[in-house]
Design a protein with these regions (language model features):
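PLP-dependent enzyme catalytic core of the Aspartate aminotransferase-like
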Residues: 2-3, 124, 133, 147, ...
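N-terminal "arm"/small-domain region of PLP-dependent enzymes with the aminotransferase-like
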Residues: 2-66, 74-75
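Conserved small-domain helix->loop->beta segment predominantly found in fold-type I
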Residues: 276-279, 284-285, 290, 294, ...
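Short loop segments at secondary-structure junctions
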Residues: 39, 229-232, 352-355
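Short hydrophobic/aromatic beta-strand micro-patches
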Residues: 227, 349-351, 411-413
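Conserved N-terminal alpha-helix of the aminotransferase class I/II PLP-enzyme fold
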Residues: 44-96, 118-125
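Conserved PLP-enzyme active-site core in the AAT-like
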Residues: 3-6, 16-18, 22-25, 85-315
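C-terminal core of ALDH-fold dehydrogenases
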Residues: 9, 16-35, 357-397
Length: 434
């Protein structure tokens, strides 16, 4: 039984409140305590040795694990249907940890070309300095993913809902391609959260989240989470020496032999978090836990508000097109209805008539929407991707990702939808004055 295991409930809403935690046995505190401690006392020498030899559960140093973080990790793992998770300093740190655990110099990744700008930069510019190359492909083409695989490819990667074009990733089809080639499918599910989609149920093996967004929900912390589905058989694949060959850093331990379905997440913690140090602070974990407790209620309202706003923009004369997977005009509508039956999220983009100038005038006329580089806040947000979040991409890369000069991205919050629509209408009128 896990150290922090809560009641054996199965309902999603119940898990958001109880998974991974019981009342404190000493004080009776109902809320998860913040264990603001750098390190933890060993009761005796044998206990200490067991921790360092990975022979028992417990905490040594908060860079490796922390009791507050452990509750968050177990809670999100339960919500995603995984076998384990690691809380990281940011979503970028979670993505880097996944790649660094599986890849070495000379390895290769196949990724969707419709990605968050920071992830694109990591794959396109930073990782090649360490000998890891990435081929970017059309997220809607399963065959493009298949054709790009080489003998050195270690994983397929994509976002369930592409950023900012909202392309929907065909998880089941891509999982089949990945598994046929002997590699895992890694998915960023930040836009969806486990409330709207559980990627592991559709064949994904590893899930990455930016906890900064909808999981915490209020724009007050930076954090990430890496979830292991425990579904990939590392031992039968010949592509992963980091998991199937002796590791000198732990006396020739073979992670796949010793930990089975937990091999990936164990190495990620015992090596990646230990050596790269991108751990989450316990105060951050506490705030994310508070956000997750209301995740179902918030996501319902986010989706309801988004549908109202999308309907308004879709009929407005100043709008050329709206990119939201629930619209009949969206090419992935049918796939979205299967993968995301509760809704296609609260982030979407639209193209405004008049290009960059109109987009700038529109944004500067808004008073309720906040102009900033984030999503998933309780407050509604707006940004112009081509000049901000994706500005480091080349013109060709922007075009391939469908990011035009007039593209505006919205993250719809929890305000009254009528107020949001009024604010957007004012901005659209201002944008067309020339």
């Amino acid at each position: 039984m896990s150290e922090h295991e809560g009641p054996r409930a199965t309902g999603f809403d119940t898990l958001t409140l109880h998974a991974g935690q019981q009342p404190d046995p000493v004080t009776g505190a109902r809320a998860t305590p913040i264990y603001q401690s750098a390190s933890f006392v060993f009761p005796d020498s044998d206990f200490a040795a067991g921790l360092f030899n990975i022979e028992r559960a417990g905490h040594v140093y908060s860079r490796l694990s922390n009791p507050t973080n452990a509750v968050l990790e177990e809670r999100l793992s339960a919500l995603e249907g995984g076998v384990g998770a690691i809380a990281t300093a940011s979503g970028q740190a979670a993505m880097h940890l996944a790649v660094a655990t599986l890849c070495s110099a000379g390895d290769h990744i196949v990724a969707s070309r419709s990605l968050y700008g920071g992830t694109h930069n990591l794959l396109e510019y930073t990782l090649p300095r360490f000998g890891i190359e990435t081929t970017f492909v059309d997220p809607r083409s399963v065959e493009a993913f298949r054709s790009a695989i080489t003998p050195s490819t270690k994983l397929l990667f994509g976002e369930i809902l592409g950023n900012p074009g909202l392309e929907v990733l065909d998880l089941s089809a891509l999982a089949e391609v990945a598994h046929d080639a002997g590699m895992p499918l890694v998915v960023d599910s930040t836009f969806a959260t486990p409330y709207l989609c559980k990627p592991i149920e559709h064949g994904a093996d590893i899930v990455v989240h930016s906890a900064t967004k909808f999981l915490s929900g209020h724009g007050i912390v930076i954090g990430g989470l890496l979830v292991d589905g425990g579904t990939f058989d590392w031992e039968t694949s010949e592509r992963f020496p980091t998991l199937t060959q002796p590791y000198e850093g732990f006396h020739d331990l073979v992670f796949a032999e010793e930990f089975g379905p937990l091999a990936f997440i164990t190495r990620a913690r015992k090596e990646g978090i230990r050596d790269f140090g991108a751990c989450m602070a316990p105060t951050t974990a506490f705030h994310v836990l508070q956000g997750i407790e209301t995740l179902p209620l918030r996501m319902q309202r986010h989706v309801e508000n988004t549908r109202r706003v999308v309907a308004f923009l879709d009929e407005h004369e100043a709008v050329e097109s709206v990119l939201y997977p629930e619209l009949d005009s969206h090419p992935d509508r049918e796939l979205a209805s299967r993968l995301l039956p509760k809704g296609a999220g609260a982030v979407f983009s639209f193209n405004i008539k008049g290009g960059r100038g109109a987009g700038r005038a529109f944004i500067e006329a808004l008073s309720l929407f906040s102009h900033l580089a984030n999503i998933g806040d309780a407050k509604s947000l707006v940004i112009h991707p081509a000049s901000t979040t994706h500005h480091r991409m080349s013109p060709d890369a922007l075009a391939s990702a469908g990011i035009g000069e007039g593209l505006v991205r919205l993250s719809i919050g929890l305000e009254d939808p009528g107020d949001l629509i009024e604010d957007l209408g004012r901005g659209l009128r201002r944008s067309q004055r020339g």
